[in-house]
A protein has these predicted regions:
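Charge-rich, low-complexity segments
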Residues: 2-92
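Terminal, regulation- and interaction-focused segments at domain boundaries
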Residues: 94-101
Length: 198
């Protein structure tokens, strides 16, 4: 009986240690992604500041950023059949920046602005404004390579930049919630009632 209790305790300790090690491993993996998001938020916010200091209209209204949670990364990898050791090679939206604009034409101004920059390289783009998704989702997506410096050296991080208007962002939030509510199959009558999608 006593031996059984000791064995269970040892298994619990081992499991806890393995979990702690996994969390530490993920923290190390995600550190450069955190850095990329922090730096890009500062840079895009500085663009807004420069426009406003010059007394001219800024095509960027708001800057948001995030790094996917560990659970979201694992869930997406499993959904796409990506092995854990291939996640960094095959998932390009671990780091994400969202640029909110007032008007649709501002989005294309921002895209041009990003393409001119020397500190990031556009590797792919998808225009969901001219090619609206069936769900009604609209946004302009860019994947850029962005270089960060850590204590371990230079690393190139893929970052997804989503550019959209306030209205598009509002619909995207609703659409995301509806996808979960209806398990990815939004009924036609719900789409029809959600006139904001256009």
């Amino acid at each position: 009986m006593f031996l059984c209790v000791i064995m269970k305790y040892n298994y619990a300790i081992k499991a806890e240690m393995e979990t702690t090690m996994e969390i530490q491993m993920w923290k190390e993996i995600l550190t450069p992604y955190d850095l990329a998001v922090e730096e890009l938020q500062i840079k895009f916010n500085h663009i807004i500041k420069e426009y406003r200091q010059a007394g001219v209209y800024s095509p960027i209204e708001q800057v948001l950023g995030r790094v996917k949670s560990i659970s979201s990364i694992i869930e997406k990898a499993q959904r796409r059949g990506i092995e854990i050791d291939k996640i960094q090679e095959k998932l390009f939206d671990i780091a994400g920046i969202r640029l909110i604009c007032q008007f649709t034409e501002d989005i294309y101004t921002v895209v041009k602005l990003i393409k001119k920059r020397k500190d990031m390289t556009v590797i792919s783009e998808k225009d969901y404004i001219k090619n609206i998704k069936e769900s009604g989702y609209r946004s302009y997506h860019l994947i850029v390579h962005y270089e960060v410096e850590t204590v371990k050296g230079t690393t190139i991080i893929p970052v997804e930049i989503q550019i959209r208007t306030l209205g598009m962002n509002f619909w995207a939030i609703i659409e995301h919630s509806l996808q979960y509510k209806y398990n990815g199959e939004i009924p036609a009558h719900v789409k029809e009632r959600s006139s904001v999608r256009r």
